[in-house]
């Protein structure tokens, strides 16, 4: 069995300077990160999803992290391959449903998009040309789009990716980039990640013109036509850390989807005394819904 790209050492290394740690039983990498304002560290699953195996030996993985003086572990599971909820709840201190992911599965009977989306695709194709590209060949244009997105959405933390991250993704054989061009100029791009019958929407960004012309619509259409045979496509969930009733991105994805899946946010306290101390330092309740509580934005 091939290693899932989100669990691979090549992908984990893309998050440098964060240090990858291999969890042997979970068969995945997590990232060691400093706890701001302290000498301590905790760990998180790789963005956007932590792909892990249902192996009771995960308790040994937790012990290894504890011996490495890691305070906590937090991870968002992959709704297409995650262990069942009972396993997650039995092994993690925190396990709660996280986001609804919008999925396209051509084997299901309702495989047509919404009428609204078909109309948007038709209109956008009059203004742009779409095709598969090598991300490395368009990295400057992509970075301009992505840094604009970061600034516009005030994206901070791990998702404020450096150029080196995209350079690493660009050479991964599992990554496919579909781009839209207007009068020959890069207007929108979308990176998709593939693994054994599963396809994941990874990251997307557009120029102002690309957004105005709604180039994302034909890009999604291209992805579905390219991957529909023998694949389930995960478009991801709504924007932000929590779901909202008023979310244009959710409506956009839902219009292409014909199924829904739910993933989980899982957390584990590896050093209880240290966790309590870090929470006390921030003046937060250790039992707060946000995990780890000491990283909340109180």
Model-derived features: positions:
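A conserved beta-strand-loop-helix scaffold within acyl/acetyltransferase catalytic domains
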Residues: 1-42, 81-82, 87-211, 227
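Active-site/acyl-donor-binding loops of N-acyltransferases
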Residues: 2-21, 25-28, 33-39, 90-110, ...
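The substrate-binding groove and active-site-proximal loops of carbohydrate-active enzymes
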Residues: 45-53
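Non-catalytic accessory segments adjacent to catalytic cores
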Residues: 56-98
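Short amphipathic alpha-helical segments and helix-helix/interface helices
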Residues: 58-65, 118-121, 163-167, 224, ...
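Aromatic (often tryptophan-rich) hydrophobic motifs at membrane interfaces
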Residues: 60, 174-278
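A structural signal for short, well-ordered beta-strand segments and their strand-loop junctions
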Residues: 72-78, 132-134, 179, 232-236
């Amino acid at each position: 069995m091939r290693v899932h790209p989100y669990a691979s050492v090549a992908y984990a290394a893309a998050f440098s300077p964060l240090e990858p740690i291999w969890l042997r039983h979970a068969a995945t990498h997590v990232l060691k990160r400093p706890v701001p304002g302290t000498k301590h560290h905790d760990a998180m699953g790789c963005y956007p999803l932590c792909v892990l195996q249902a192996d009771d030996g995960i308790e040994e993985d937790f012990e290894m992290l504890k011996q490495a003086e890691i305070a906590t572990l937090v991870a968002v599971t992959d709704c297409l391959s995650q262990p069942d909820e009972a396993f997650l709840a039995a092994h993690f201190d925190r396990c709660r449903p996280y986001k609804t992911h919008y999925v396209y599965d051509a084997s299901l009977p309702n495989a047509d998009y919404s009428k609204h989306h078909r109309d948007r695709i038709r209109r956008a194709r009059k203004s742009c040309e779409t095709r598969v590209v090598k991300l490395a060949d368009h990295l400057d244009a992509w970075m301009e789009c992505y840094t604009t997105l970061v600034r516009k959405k005030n994206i901070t933390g791990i998702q404020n990716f450096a150029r080196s991250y995209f350079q690493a993704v660009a050479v991964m054989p599992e990554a496919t980039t579909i781009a839209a061009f207007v009068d020959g100029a890069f207007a929108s791009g979308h990176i998709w990640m593939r693994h054994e019958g599963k396809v994941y929407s990874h990251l997307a960004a557009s120029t102002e013109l690309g957004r105005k012309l709604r180039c994302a619509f034909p890009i999604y259409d291209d992805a579905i036509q390219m991957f529909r045979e023998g694949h389930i496509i995960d478009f991801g969930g709504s924007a932000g850390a929590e779901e909202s009733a008023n979310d244009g991105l959710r409506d956009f994805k839902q219009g292409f989807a014909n199924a829904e899946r739910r993933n989980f946010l899982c957390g584990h306290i590896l050093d209880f005394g240290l966790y309590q101390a870090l929470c006390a330092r921030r003046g937060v309740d250790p039992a707060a819904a946000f995990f780890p509580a000491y990283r909340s934005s109180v």
